[in-house]
Amino acid sequence: MKPFLRWCFVATALTLAGCSNTSWRKSEVLAVPLQPTLQQEVILARMEQILASRALTDDERAQLLYERGVLYDSLGLRALARNDFSQALAIRPDMPEVFNYLGIYLTQAGNFDAAYEAFDSVLELDPTYNYAHLNRGIALYYGGRDKLAQDDLLAFYQDDPNDPFRSLWLYLAEQKLDEKQAKEVLRQHFEKSDKEQWGWNIVEFYLGNISEQTLMERLKADATDNTSLAEHLSETNFYLGKYYLSLGDLDSATALFKLAVANNVHNFVEHRYALLELSLLGQDQDDLAESDQQ
């Protein structure tokens, strides 16, 4: 091949590759990963000052430790959050919300029996604490107790049938019992709902009503700012990951769980359990291992 023709061939190939990469970047829906805000940092500093003072009753100190733990958790600082929750519980052992968080952490670590006990404690202290049914249901789901998981997640769904994510978690549990029946129940829940919340688009994808491309187009159109985009992506990528996992497509599932985590929406259920899914899939790199141990 003559030098000039060879150069033209290489230039054309590079141009086509560049166009392909550019096209991919333009079509991909991405958000800037969420970062700590100045307001959150100021609140943490103020909490530290208040906790350092001695002018707090035990109840006030326990409550403030809990609130700081919640803030740490939202920033992904689970070791610090767990330390605050443990201190709060040592002062006031009757705080159901603290047991709820500790149960979530135990589930993420794969310590399911201890997680069940934590959520049992939540409901003993406050039978109306409905999110304990969600979190215990998820722990039972990952712990392989499918029928018990269904019972808890059904109770959680019945508390608000218009919440699409309650239907999705119930479907995931029932899918392990009878996939065909689970999809029919999901369809009934969709038809009965008001369909106002964004997550019903994910349900429509699960039902085969819309394509993945349409789902992502709706996601992009619905997001009002970067925060809502990051949240929607965390949710959507997690449930897409579960969908592909059910098809046996481990590579796609793994990639989607990583994308769910990448948005840093630390306090979302989908972020928490995308990490667990990656661990179960063998993606236990150092950062995942540290997360499970905290």
Curated annotation (Swiss-Prot):
Positions of S-diacylglycerol cysteine lipidation: 19
SUPFAM superfamilies: TPR-like
TPR repeats: 62-95, 96-129, 234-267
A GO cellular component annotation in the UniProt record: plasma membrane
InterPro entries in the cross-refs: Lipoprotein_NlpI, TPR-like_helical_dom_sf, TPR_rpt, Ycf3
Lipidated residue numbers (N-palmitoyl cysteine): 19
Bilayer topology annotation: Lipid-anchor
Subcellular localization: Cell membrane
KW Transit peptide (keyword) present: no
Predominant subcellular localization, coarse grouping: membrane
Any one GO biological process: cell division
Keywords: Cell cycle, Cell division, Cell membrane, Lipoprotein, Membrane, Palmitate, Repeat, Signal, TPR repeat
Pfam families attached to this UniProt entry: TPR_16
Signal peptide per UniProt: 1-18
Recorded superkingdom: Bacteria
Protein purpose: May be involved in cell division. May play a role in bacterial septation or regulation of cell wall degradation during cell division.
Subunit composition and interactions: Homodimer.
Full protein name: Lipoprotein NlpI
Native source organism of the sequence: Escherichia coli O17:K52:H18 (strain UMN026 / ExPEC)
